[in-house]
Amino acid sequence: MAAACASQGGKPESTVEPLAARPDLTWRVSTRYQVDLWLHGYAMLQKDTTLVPYFKPGYRDSIDAFKKRGNISTLLDTDGDSLRTQLASDSKLVGGQFLGLYFRSWATTQKAIDQYLKNAVSEDDTPRRMNTRQLIDPDSRAVFAIIQASYSTRPEQHWLRSFTAAMRDEDTKYYANYWRTQQTNRAAIFAAVDSLWTQTYFAKFRKFLTKSGQSRGEILLSLPLQGEGRTLGEPDRGPTIAVTFPDSVSEAVQAMYVLAHEVISPVSNGAVNDNTTPAEKKEGVADHYTSPAAVRGGLQLLQKIAPELVVGYARFYLDAAHISYTPGAEVAAIEKAFPLRPTIADQLTHQLDTDLSGS
């Protein structure tokens, strides 16, 4: 049984399948409140222009409708235009959407951000020259470096301050209760995903995960996400991968599709890196291939370990990209919609064969 955990004061934190129940289960399925809250804020602000959307289509509209019904207004509404404008013009800020994955609770997320901003900006709002290597506490040094990667300039730090204040307002006024209700309403969906993973697909993914250096990790079901998951690689604990939280029990398998799309990234990113020149990387050509390589790589992985999922996976990503297809020709449609340089595709195939060979 999945257990819902709450921090002191009734704040939602996570829904977790205990590893103790399955000592061999080195990957677990769970949820994490602050991951959803942080991604929620980005979903409400970020313009989705990618072929596979960053966020679940209709998510923003559904939240707007929910707030309208409850006559709820927050700082995210009043400051939304300025936050949205700056986000659209600064790619570093976009990368900050991964920040929630580094922390175990919303309280620790806020504390880290507050400490970072206190050290980065003085009381009179002038920037301080901060060298994270000079911090005595190694944990603080690591956390500050993580935050600084996306929020290093004064305008970016102002954006972070405003965005965090908006997230606090969202959390206090409605999102904590909204999230908790969603977890209750989706308990059967969570159980269905967990069952698919523990009873069937962990065993099928296990060899690839082990061979690709991902022998343990955590799968987070995330409300704002659909086809594009979010992956944080942590050497000590293994990857934390946020995937879509399906909308129904019948769609529970969608979480496996997105997981395949995400766990292939060490292989797909390596293939792109090895088959693009430094000049192409500088010009953004390599970035152009990253998403197609993940979609194609996830498909190839499932063809080898779980062929029963291939057609559903292909349809899921074609639908996400709003691309029509002929039933029975889904794989060909994926290859056409997500083109790859032949050398990248060949390396994907070769590396998968290597990772899945032997015992």
Regions found by a protein language model. Give the residues of each.
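Active-site scaffold of zinc-dependent metalloenzymes
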Residues: 226-254
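Post-HEXXH active-site segment of zinc metalloproteases
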Residues: 269-294
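N-terminal mature-domain "stem" immediately C-terminal to a signal peptide or N-terminal signal-anchor/transmembrane
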Residues: 11-133, 324-327, 331-353, 357
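C-terminal motif of bacterial Sec signal peptides marking the signal peptidase cleavage site
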Residues: 2-4
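Bacterial signal peptide processing site
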Residues: 6-8
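Auxiliary, metal-adjacent structural segments of Zn-dependent hydrolase domains
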Residues: 175-236, 308
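Active-site recognition of the HExxH zinc-binding catalytic motif
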Residues: 253-274, 295-296
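Short helix/loop segments within enzyme catalytic domains
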Residues: 303-327
